[in-house]
Amino acid sequence: MNPEHSPLGKATVYANQYDASLLFPIPRAGAREQIGIGAPLPFFGTDIWNAYELSWLNARGKPQIAIATFYVPAESPNIVESKSFKLYLGSFAQTAFESADAVRDALKRDVSAACDASVTVRLATPAEFRKLQMDELDGLSLDRLDLDAHVYETDPSFLTASHGEAPVEETLVTDLLKSNCPVTGQPDWGSVQIHYVGAPIDHAGLLRYIISFRNHTGFHEQCVERIFVDILRACQPVKLAVYARYTRRGGLDINPFRTNYNQPMPDNARTARQ
């Protein structure tokens, strides 16, 4: 299915009864082909979706709430278009379920079917809300650099590494990522963490490269994969991991993670802007 056929940018009818058919899958393959990603994938990882506006009725008609987290594997053939995800979650609001476990089971079944892969789902009930943490991405901030930047279309030529120098291990972060929805043109704001082992990457060039996404159109997952492959090709690190946390829209935030080496799943602590 193509993004232009999705609910994005169209008049919306909000369903008030559970409806799994509202989920609109979008194949990953098309966007990957555009940037030269084929099989085998040069990375693995997860897309972490947090849904803050989930509610349903219990068997006695009393509303229940929870925060849902979805872990979608990067190797899944499809992603779910975000507005369709919002409409799907909204369809739970007037539907009775026996338990939170029954809601979680329905979410796992439906989203896994849409993505054509096994999706992990976790629910945080109100009793657990105080345990949820807020934190910023760890690393050396690129935003400390005082530089000129005038290119706002993606330009990987900014990416360079000093291959004659000794390898380093660095974690770099920036809060200056902005891209745009390919269907509606709405801005998407994010923070990015880049961890690598290899020849030292030029910090100013890396920041200018991230800034060059400012007028770029692409879904969150696609932007992170573009960042990953551009750095991998231009700088040739031995190890590379890219993690982005995008601000919330429609009660959902999307946080893609891509890596080419085994490591623990990144924390799912929301940032201040989320």
Curated annotation (Swiss-Prot):
- What EC number(s) does its UniProt record assign? 1.7.1.13
Residues where NADPH binds: S82, K83, R249, G250
Give the pathway: tRNA modification; tRNA-queuosine biosynthesis
- Which InterPro entries does the entry mention? GTP-CH-I_C/QueF (IPR043133), NADPH_dep_7-cyano-7-deazaG_red (IPR050084), QueF (IPR029500), QueF_N (IPR029139), QueF_type2 (IPR016428)
Q: Which domain of life is it from?
A: Bacteria
Instruction: Tell me which residues bind substrate.
Output: V80, E81, S82, H220, E221
Chief location of this protein within or outside the cell: cytoplasm
* One GO term describing the cellular component: cytoplasm
User: GO molecular-function annotation terms?
Assistant: preQ1 synthase activity
- Known catalytic reactions: 7-aminomethyl-7-carbaguanine + 2 NADP(+) = 7-cyano-7-deazaguanine + 2 NADPH + 3 H(+)
Q: Where is the active site?
A: C181, D188
Q: Which Pfam families did the record assign?
A: QueF (PF14489), QueF_N (PF14819)
Q: Name the UniProt key words of this record, in alphabetical order.
A: Cytoplasm, NADP, Oxidoreductase, Queuosine biosynthesis
GO BP of this protein: queuosine biosynthetic process; tRNA modification
Task: Tell where it localizes.
Answer: Cytoplasm
Q: Which family does it belong to?
A: Belongs to the GTP cyclohydrolase I family. QueF type 2 subfamily.
Q: Which NCBIfam families match?
A: QueF
General function of this protein: Catalyzes the NADPH-dependent reduction of 7-cyano-7-deazaguanine (preQ0) to 7-aminomethyl-7-deazaguanine (preQ1).
Q: How does it assemble?
A: Homodimer.
Q: What protein am I looking at?
A: NADPH-dependent 7-cyano-7-deazaguanine reductase
Q: Which organism is it from?
A: Burkholderia pseudomallei (strain K96243)
Supply the source organism's classification: Bacteria, Pseudomonadati, Pseudomonadota, Betaproteobacteria, Burkholderiales
